Design a protein with these regions (language model features):
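NAD(P)-dependent short-chain dehydrogenase/reductase
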Residues: 149-208, 216
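N-terminal Rossmann-fold cofactor-binding loop
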Residues: 27-37, 51-52, 74-75
């Protein structure tokens, strides 16, 4: 299968390059810096720069490569920053997705869009299934939901993958908003880095979700795309925890004694509202008989054992 992987330099993108190694993959990123260590097959095209908000660039890339599938991992996810300026989030998370869908329709390519648990408000208090009505609390969640709606309206050959709290070896900029705004690196790496500073660490304890290892999600996506069973899917590691509980498990696995202090979302005072309960049930994957997502504790243990902190 010819796959155009947009956002190949991110956490999920890099793990997808590995998981899709048996396919013909062209990776794109905002810039090619940071991809030097990614080993591609000799006959694969080198990763190229692509601005997803530039319609001409998108058209040229899609029409020259003519993929069977486009996987869009590109996203603007600085949740708190988006509350102050939602325009960029709408451009990247929604309008660019709509353009991709229209272009994919022209070349008859399927489109896979990675969405978020933040499309829900958390009021259900039980795991969300794919059919539950979304109601985002934040501008970020609204931008991702807009992307979902525009994709569904434009092109039926699509996969929408809702997931949560991604962490992986590539790290991610701006993914630790609930701990310290503008921290670089994913939540796990941020926790391990803050532990070296010797100060108490405050982590919210009233947001329950399922942090997910990108290696596991990439493997699940690789399995799903073989089915051509288009639609909306929830895909997270199994189980649930608060971010405080997750942080404590990070330190336990790392063998670190750290003063971790639980704090409420209200006391933490982040600009964007988060759902108090956004656990996703992988109902559609289970219905297909292909849910391979292991418990979050097992995934985290493997990640911490790798000893990679960025």
């Amino acid at each position: 299968m010819k796959i155009l992987l947009i956002g190949a330099s991110g956490q999920l993108g890099r793990d997808l390059l590995t998981a899709l190694a048996h396919h013909h993959v062209l990776g794109t990123t905002r810039g090619t810096a940071g991809l030097e260590h990614v080993k591609l097959e000799a006959d694969w095209p080198s990763p190229i720069a692509l601005d997803v908000c530039n319609e001409a660039d998108l058209r040229t890339t899609i029409f020259s490569f003519v993929p069977n599938l486009v996987i869009n991992c590109a996203a603007y996810h600085r949740v708190d920053d988006i509350e102050r300026d939602a325009a960029q989030a709408l451009a990247v998370n929604a309008l660019a997705v709509h353009r991709m869908a229209l272009l994919c329709r022209e070349v008859d390519a399927a489109l896979l869009y990675v969405s978020t648990d933040y499309v829900f408000d958390g009021a259900k208090g039980a795991p969300y299934v794919e059919a539950d009505p979304p109601n985002p609390l934040s501008a970020y969640g609204a931008s991702k939901l807009a992307g979902e709606l525009l994709l569904r309206a434009a092109w039926p050959k699509h996969y929408i993958i809702r997931t949560c709290g991604l962490y992986g070896l590539a790290g991610a900029s701006g993914k630790a908003d609930d701990v310290r705004p503008r921290s670089s690196g994913n939540f796990v790496n941020t926790m391990l880095r803050l532990a070296t500073e010797g100060r108490p660490i405050r982590v919210v304890d009233d947001q329950t979700c399922t942090p997910t290892f990108t290696r596991d999600l990439a493997a699940q996506i690789a399995l799903l795309i073989e089915t051509e069973a288009y639609g909306t899917y929830h895909a997270t590691n199994d189980g649930a925890c608060t971010w405080y509980e997750f942080a404590r498990e990070v330190f336990r696995l790392a063998g670190l004694s750290v003063d971790v202090q639980p704090v409420s979302s209200a006391a933490y005072g982040a600009p964007a509202r988060r759902p108090p309960y956004s656990v996703l049930e992988n109902h559609a994957l289970k219905a297909l008989g292909i849910d391979r997502m292991r418990p979050w504790q097992e995934a985290l243990a493997e990640y911490v054992a790798m000893g990679v902190v960025q």
